[in-house]
């Protein structure tokens, strides 16, 4: 850059930039002299904010050059058009956050903060940003811009929504900075009367600055009595001489000179900035009650709900009973100690089966006849109907003593609904066990070996002998799902807030890198996952009777929970980079977590899936982690078991693969987590 250009703090040379089919800059030139206020005027949508972002380096020109005297971000103070501040921080915390990012000492932050309070008439410093008015918010935003005493100050519509009297005081303060501290200020405004206070102004229209100079010189040049009249004259002349500028296939041949770069990402991770980000994100989390509830308390509540509602035996199911032997209300007094083969016995063994079912918490209701019982079942009033004939006990003697003479009319009869397979299977199993128990009780009371009524088969359970319910074998998959889901909700919520509210973009102007933000988020996510996962595991395996075998594999069980949280965290970042709102981001999380839960055996074993679908399900991270965790908990497999090693390695490989996808996508889609406002 030649020396004469350095009489300017900012110099834009032959800038071209297009959006879609319309050019925003069409050979724009701009000169901002040192120690002056430059007022940039123009209608809404003409590209003023885009020009400022190009100067800051967050956007690039298609061609042309921007030369700056400033070479460090710290030398520039930028106030975006939108607020771009964390709403859950107080004004005091916001100043401390940005002061730390600019590597200011605490003492210097306090001194500068007191100056800005007096200058900008800021509200109570303990007020949350989200609770103050729009005008107050813009004053805080301006204060953040001035906090680190920058040499070049760039303000995008700083006085919008501010009281006219205070607006004048702010202008007086800016003029004083220029005179006493030799600051250079670029300010965009819609208020033409404000522009009269600037040392130099530029009117931007149709992609160029149609005029640039001191306000008095422009008024004199066009023989106008005010700046507004002069600009109206300029606009009329431009409309008469130019057609609207549209992008054509012709390529601009202007050489693209090297522009000054302020937004170069830092090569080293700054732990001071990470500490500031940790503090900010911690405040944002614990003051966002709904997010804190979702990512910490809700997993604990869901684990409790799971243990109370999934996989247990169904209770209080209604069964209609017709017992021609005895009223079922009298069965509670039945004593089975007498043998039915004794003379003059009055035993009614149907009571054994009825009492057995009652002990399983079935609701038994007596009906008068078979037709009524069957109709109640067919009309979905009851789930089953059981009939014991009048001579059931006497015929049972025949069944045991002379089996070949036992008639079909002596059988107990059952009619049940088939609309719910789980209900049907449980009732059928329990009634079968009740009749088996009835026969065994009869044999025992008559001093016979009750094993006569058992199957001639020895059953040896190798693994899972304590597994009694479906929930026992799906608890691990549920914990893996919770670890994935709630970590992903945290990362997608925080990152989309940073992205959509412009918070990350503004922090990057203060030197923050995306890597530093991700490190701070990752630390908080791990703290959350360790906290709620520990409590959830205690609930699932200590407070509720889900079986677990204590072995060295428990360490790997915990590691798998943490790895699943990493996968969820990374997937949330991916969704945040691809989606524009929290609504879409959260729905992606819901859909993917539910799909994995369905396909990984959390609802039904994958053995019931088609061969092709099962081959896909076996590769899902939730399946890999959940199956390995089940093997550790229910089979007692240890760290050195091949299946544990393979399952853990494959789950970790998913996290690495997702990380590589994020890195690659960030190279292809630049600024996918950043929106500059």
Where are these regions (language model features)?
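Membrane-spanning alpha-helical segments of multipass transporters and channels
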Residues: 221, 301-310, 325, 467, ...
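Extracytoplasmic/periplasmic domains immediately adjacent to an N-terminal transmembrane anchor
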Residues: 189, 259-472, 642-644, 664, ...
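Conserved ABC ATPase "signature" region
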Residues: 96, 100, 108-124
